């Protein structure tokens, strides 16, 4: 991906540093916001490929699978929602992250790569005089060649083209506007679908609450009641090792069908950098070691 030390300037406003997972807002006195690891990796991939639609599968592969995790679609939806809050972006009129229905996501703002090295600019300035010399030599070549071409063209006598009698136009029996209207409607229909169709957001239901932290799961997700004791132990262990003001606002549980469960700890916007994804396995007598 990007070189170490490289930063990105988004829409001439946010300075994104993927190495420290930070986002500085120039309109707020360079106020620095810490991103979670998931949100930072999503923004890095979008910034590397601006204006390109990234599929949900590509984002899953880079953010989770390369780290050894397998999560469902709700984890990506939640991470995109948190990232938009950090960018102060709107879902209805986005200026940064745009949802492309049935395809994925797209970074639509301007992106400028800020390299830590300034030698590139000096090398460009040195090369400019050479390009001026090349232009001058090219003009000289054109000046020499053009007269010879003109002389050659004068010497060649083109044969006269035979005169073809014009045919009277045949009156069309079909109204010429009908094909144009059909073509216009065919072009207009997909545009209307893209503009007026909003992707459905994931819906969640609560399956429990431990240490004042609600546990959520997607509405259509299979039952995972047999995992509740392990979830309770994990949350109690997590709360014990974290300060009260940085506790998660909710935990999203997914999986459970392959003897493993994924827990997404979601924090508020002030502590979003602590968002983390954990995986626990069935058959563990004491799962608390990985739930710190």
From Swiss-Prot:
Single GO term (MF): DNA binding
Annotated phenotype, changing residue 152 to S: In strain: AQ3815
A Gene Ontology biological process term: regulation of DNA-templated transcription
Signal peptide bounds: none
InterPro entries given in the database record: OmpR/PhoB-type_DNA-bd, Sig_transdc_resp-reg_C-effctor, WH-like_DNA-bd_sf
Region Disordered: start-end pairs: 119-140
GO CC, any one term: plasma membrane
Major location (coarse): membrane
Stretches in topological domain Cytoplasmic: 1-180
Topology feature Periplasmic, residues: 198-292
Superkingdom, taxonomy of origin: Bacteria
One Pfam entry name: Trans_reg_C
DNA-binding region(s), chain positions: 6-109
Keywords annotated in UniProt: Activator, Cell membrane, DNA-binding, Membrane, Transcription, Transcription regulation, Transmembrane, Transmembrane helix, Two-component regulatory system
Membrane topology of the entry: Single-pass membrane protein
Function: In the presence of ToxS, promotes the expression of the thermostable direct hemolysin 2. May be a global regulator.
Protein name (database record): Cholera toxin homolog transcriptional activator
